[in-house]
Amino acid sequence: MKNTEINIRDPFVLVEDGTYYMYGTRAATCWGAADGFDCYVSKDMEDWDGPFEVFHKPEDFWADRNCWAPEVHKYRGFYYMFATFKDSSVHGGTAILKSESPLGPFVMYSDRQITPRDWECIDGTFYVSPDGTPYMVFVHEWVQISDGSICAVELSRDLKEAVSEPVTLFHASEAVGWVQTITNKNRPGLHYVTDGPYLYRTGGGRLIMLWSSFGKEGYTEALAYSDNGDITGKWTQDDRLLFLKDGGHGMIFESISGELYLTLHTPNEHLKEHPVFYRLIEEEDTLRVAELS
């Protein structure tokens, strides 16, 4: 199938042994009870096989609602899935699952979510600092705090648990050059959304974070920069958006031929979402989309 036939949100691509493995949130069950995650497989980013189910909730699973934003990272010889689960009675968050294969089956590895159990959290991603320290970088959601934030927590070296208190890196409202508020009938007032953090280091050593929110033209892909090249730095927001209209929750990967690509979902409309791929250019210690220049 073509990527236009694949109905997922939050695409994430792992490149392994000349093969692209693409994971994502099932759009059909995105906003309700869901039971797992799939993978699509390709050799060229054009024709895809699948979906192949890589995780299915067991009967006694701890979260009965949404399954969101699966990311698969290879670390010390195993494949770790960072995925968000929501429940109707307790706070949701990002857990870590483990497999010996990118095609699963993935099984629960952490004890429920890594993120704080009294926070509403989503979209955990994986980051390893230059000194080898692993972190989960995640969203503390606007649904609980109104001004959504991006936070980080240090992980144990085996990725089994958090070993530090969470630290707030920045709030969505700090992106004063472009961010727009939203309203919601279930929560009075104006709110700022944070979604989908992803870390990328330039050839010059600059640490960039991709993240999503809403701008004047809808869902967006934004850029933030650390001033010390690590997660512990002071983060500043770029007024220039990487992708500005009706698409987001992206990540970066290197193609089999060595080119840099951005994938994200667009449009940001239920049952119409699909993954797209744009070649990226790294210049002046930042990123831009080649096809949009």
Residue ranges and their predicted role:
Residues 1-293:
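Carbohydrate-active catalytic/glycan-binding domains of CAZyme proteins
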